[in-house]
């Protein structure tokens, strides 16, 4: 028995294992680099810019915002859905990888037969004898397809790349949830400021209407001027319910992002909201490799790899496949002897070669489909990279513009406050009118309103830079490893 297990048949089997996996019909990997003709760095920005940590939103130094985003990351339903999709993709990757390994099955069987003995037609009815037989067997079966042309390997690699793309999709959803939550938060901060300022302006205009009515009664202004003041007052009054409605709608959107009902947000944003604006410029010369950390760019790159490997697998279907099989076990007439493998053992070895001769054009059509999908994904990846570059440059330019706009409005606020203070002193000293003071105070509130909106726009423009770069701009990743996999897949190598 021992000599049989060392026979040339098993040597041939070992050689077949070594030969399998030496070929691949997938196209060559695309040239390294994100896109041809792209500059090595983003030229926008200022040299004295400082970088942000991975949790870049902490630069706003707002614990309310930090808690809100932690809540969103833990309870957002879009993230829960994306996490489930990732688990499914990882499971599919393991399914596609299973074809690389031998299939081993074990079995236990028993059978019983009762038949007439030879020479009788009706057995016991005719007085003849009967033959009764019991058989018990155990088996261990082995089968393996040699991956000579790389079909199974390419299928496994395609599944793995799809799983990595799903992991990047999860990061894209995470970034989108953060961006939407931060946007809603700053919209709420600005809306509350606008409501407070609108209320102050209404009070000022109410006094202005009263003063105008007194002046009209004394013949100092015309009825047209009085109507204009009243109309202005009513217009501002009418804007207050609209602002309050917008605030409620934004709070409702934020509630959905954190997985809550809109009437259950007081503990998160019920108090004072005081985020600190970060006006640090974006550093100049950011390396173009930062685009590689964008989840959408990385995901489409992995889908391009998946399409490449899928094309290789479909090409391999044109060639013969070689499969090996072996089974061993025991067979006995009594259940107690079935595990007596030394006296009752059975061994079967087999090999099969299957070559496609005629498939009605199915194989060639599958190759053409895979080739078209590869070309399609190449275009998708190129478009994604170009779009990402355009979004980064636009976001950096917008951030610089919003910073300048905020500086101008801040200077204008200093002037408006000085004008209101001057009119207040003139009125107190009896050399100025109360109407002039009210007009100056209203102008100050209007500048404060514009400055509040500008502060929100600066924060959202900075958010736009982070989102366009896929997060922070401090950690420049290495060139992405197309075979890097989530931990759940790596653990099976």
Feature locations, PLM:
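Alpha-helical heptad-repeat coiled-coil segments that mediate oligomerization/polymerization in large
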Residues: 219-222, 388, 395, 430-434
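Periplasmic alpha-helical coiled-coil/stalk elements that build and connect Gram-negative outer-membrane
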Residues: 152, 168-286, 398, 402, ...
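Terminal intrinsically disordered/low-complexity segments used for targeting and assembly
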Residues: 2-74, 121-123, 136, 160, ...
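Sec/SRP-type N-terminal targeting helices
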Residues: 80-81, 97, 146-174, 224, ...
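Membrane-embedded beta-strand positions in outer-membrane beta-barrel channels/transporters
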Residues: 69, 137-141, 185, 287, ...
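A short glycine-centered flexible hinge/capping loop motif at secondary-structure junctions
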Residues: 216-220, 427-431, 468-472
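Short flexible linkers and secondary-structure junctions
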Residues: 23-182, 322-326, 344, 357-367, ...
């Amino acid at each position: 028995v021992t000599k049989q297990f060392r026979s040339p048949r098993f040597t041939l089997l070992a050689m077949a294992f070594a030969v399998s996996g030496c070929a691949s019909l997938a196209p060559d990997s695309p040239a390294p680099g994100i896109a041809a003709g792209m500059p090595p760095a983003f030229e926008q920005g200022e040299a004295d810019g400082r970088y942000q940590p991975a949790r870049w939103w902490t630069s706003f130094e707002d614990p309310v915002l930090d808690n809100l985003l932690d809540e969103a990351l833990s309870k957002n339903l879009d993230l829960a859905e994306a996490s489930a999709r990732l688990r499914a993709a990882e499971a599919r990757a393991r399914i596609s990888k299973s074809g690389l390994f031998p299939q081993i099955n074990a079995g236990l069987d028993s059978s019983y037969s009762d038949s007439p003995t030879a020479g009788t037609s009706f057995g016991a009815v005719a007085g003849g004898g009967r033959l009764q037989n019991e058989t018990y067997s155990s088996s261990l079966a082995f089968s393996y397809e040699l991956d000579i042309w790389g079909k199974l390997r390419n299928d496994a690699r395609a599944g793995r790349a799809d799983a990595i793309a799903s992991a990047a999709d999860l990061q894209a959803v995470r970034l989108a949830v953060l961006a939407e939550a931060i946007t809603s938060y700053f919209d709420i901060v600005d809306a509350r400021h606008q409501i407070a300022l609108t209320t102050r302006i209404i009070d000022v205009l109410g006094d202005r209407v009263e003063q105008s009515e007194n002046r009209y009664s004394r013949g100092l202004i015309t009825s047209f001027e009085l109507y204009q003041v009243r109309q202005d007052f009513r217009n501002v009054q009418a804007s207050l319910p609209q602002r309050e409605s917008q605030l409620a709608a934004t709070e409702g959107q934020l509630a959905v992002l954190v997985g809550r009902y809109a009437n259950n947000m007081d503990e998160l944003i019920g108090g004072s909201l005081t985020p600190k604006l970060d006006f640090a410029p974006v550093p100049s010369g950011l390396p173009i490799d930062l685009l590689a950390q964008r989840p959408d760019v990385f995901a489409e790159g992995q889908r391009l790899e998946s399409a490449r490997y899928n094309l290789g697998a479909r090409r391999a279907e044109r060639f013969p496949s070689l499969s090996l099989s072996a089974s061993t076990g025991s067979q006995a007439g009594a259940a107690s002897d079935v595990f007596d493998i030394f006296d009752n053992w059975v061994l079967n070895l087999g090999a099969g070669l299957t070559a496609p001769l005629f498939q009605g054009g199915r194989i060639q059509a599958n190759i053409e489909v895979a080739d078209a999908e590869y070309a399609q994904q190449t275009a998708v990846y190129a478009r994604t990279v170009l779009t990402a570059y355009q979004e980064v440059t636009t976001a950096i330019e917008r951030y610089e513009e919003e910073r300048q706009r905020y500086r101008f409005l801040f200077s204008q606020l200093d002037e408006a406050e000085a004008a209101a203070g001057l009119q207040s002193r003139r009125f107190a000293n009896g050399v100025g009118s109360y109407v002039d003071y009210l007009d100056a105070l209203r102008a100050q509130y209007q500048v404060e309103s514009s400055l509040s909106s500008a502060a929100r726009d600066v924060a959202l423009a900075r958010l736009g830079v982070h989102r366009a770069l896929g997060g922070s701009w401090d950690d420049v990743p290495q060139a992405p490893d197309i075979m890097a996999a989530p931990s759940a897949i790596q653990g099976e190598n």
